[in-house]
Amino acid sequence: DGRPKACIVIEQPTAVDTAAARMLNKFVERISGTTLPLSPGPRKGMAAVMLGRSAATVGEDGYEITCRPGELSVSTGGGKGTLYGVCTLLERYMGVDYWAKDAYTLMPNRTITLPQFSLADSPAFRFRQTFSYSNNDPDYEAWFRLEHQDQIFAGDLWVHTFNRILPASVYGKSHPEYYSFINGQRRPGDHSQWCLSNPELFELVCHKVDSIFKAHPGMKMISISQNDGNNTYCQCPECKKVDEYEGSPSGSLIRFLNKLAARFPDKEFSTLAYLYSMHPPKHVKPLKNVNIMLCDIDCKREVPLTDNASGRDFVKALEGWARISDNIFIWDYGINFDNMVTPFPNFHILQKNLALFKKNHATMVFEQVNGQRGTDFAEMRAYMLAKLMWNPDQDADLLMREFLYGYYGAAAPYLYKYQNLLQGALLASGTPLWIYDSPVSHKNGMLNHKLMRTYAEIFDKAEAAVGDDSTLLGRVQMARLPIQYSELEIARTENGNDREAMARKVEDFRMKAARYGVTQLNERNNTVE
């Protein structure tokens, strides 16, 4: 009835429990118009909302929620379990749905009542992250149980760290022997690798690592990982001997990491299995505190990783690492980096790939997607991935429909039809879906002229369905930008187009991109202008 009948009790307050109380009260107030008082203990005549008790039956970030007469309890298995439990309570039992940055729906009600129930849940992966502009909304990040690398990795050293730890600009001239030996000479440089058999380099790295951890007390993990670039690993006689014996350049890398892990047994060391180091060594096994960050950068995305040649090579590597390690971090790529504002229909493979990762001992996942506004259905991709990273056994099609109806309202049936048509056209074309694609690659397939006219008709109907709601209309128009951009890119390769009509289409794209804050077309920062 708009008056508090319960109080929030945190017996031993922590930062996470306090954040959970704030989250609960924020949405209780938005629903009912009032907040629940905080109390160090139960109050006579009031029900108690107990936050932060320990739950032994769930893992880190997991939670137990129990509701019985007079008491609602959200208990934690550690980490952010209390906060995530509160978000689940709000979503499942109080009618709040979060969709994207600052975008949520709820039903106002002066009276909030809960049934008796009990549930417990833990995440499939201990670390879950996406690139999404929505992550700038702290409530969104908590709601979708996302983390950030600087919360885990000391000094934010989490990928391609060789040159950050020992810059070639500092050590290259005085100690070229620290760097890769290729074609008869040492090659120090920003993208060179280390000579991993050099004992002096190892001791220097140990000193640097010790300094980094001392500068970041409380942090337990760091990445010691190759610089970006392929086939730049050291081929001096000693490194080459190890790699030939191990059957992969990962051999010398894992031996080096094992030595570090043994020197610092209370720390965890992550390293890349990427490009030349993707496949595991034949003999040496990573120590338990060596984390393998395995990257699927070379894989095509039109089908699950198990179903095409590029994916099967990655799966072979994944299964090989899984045989020797239970500590695998997957870096998965899920958007077109060369043309971010273009259709990328990979939604049908997300669940199967994440289930594959879980099956093969992955404990951490980073989904590199959606860094900018305007990328293909960025909000839906982030929503589905966050849900599936918590539990990869969910129905991906159901998640898609939930999002479309919640975020786009009456336009949802048309956008669902568009997604199914686009996906079907991709698969029927036999054209691979690549993270460095051009829409021109698909002009005879999923982006052919006939289909593009059909897509335009579908979006016209979607816009008309929400024409009286400026917020929903804006969301639909932003979702349409990838089709508009693709039409313009394809037109550049063709003769006979109506120049005046194309000029109008260019101006419409520019205007809508500016209206919705879409500024970047690819990861090289090429702008709309």
Features from the language model and the residues they span:
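Structured mid-domain segments that build the active-site/substrate or prosthetic-cofactor binding neighborhood
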Residues: 200-203, 211, 310-411, 417
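Catalytic domains of carbohydrate-active enzymes that cleave complex glycans
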Residues: 388-529
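Short hydrophobic beta-strand segments
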Residues: 1-17, 44-53, 73-74, 128-133
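Noncatalytic carbohydrate-binding groove/subsite architecture in carbohydrate-active enzymes
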Residues: 277-286, 290, 298-324
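Short, well-ordered secondary-structure micro-motifs within conserved domains or adaptor modules
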Residues: 37-59, 67
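Substrate-binding cleft/loops of secretory-pathway carbohydrate-active enzymes
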Residues: 270-298, 341-348, 373-382
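Aromatic-rich surface patch/π-platform used for binding flat ligands and interfaces
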Residues: 55-59, 269, 354-358
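Feature activates predominantly on carbohydrate-active enzymes
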Residues: 13-23, 27-29, 58-255, 259-265, ...
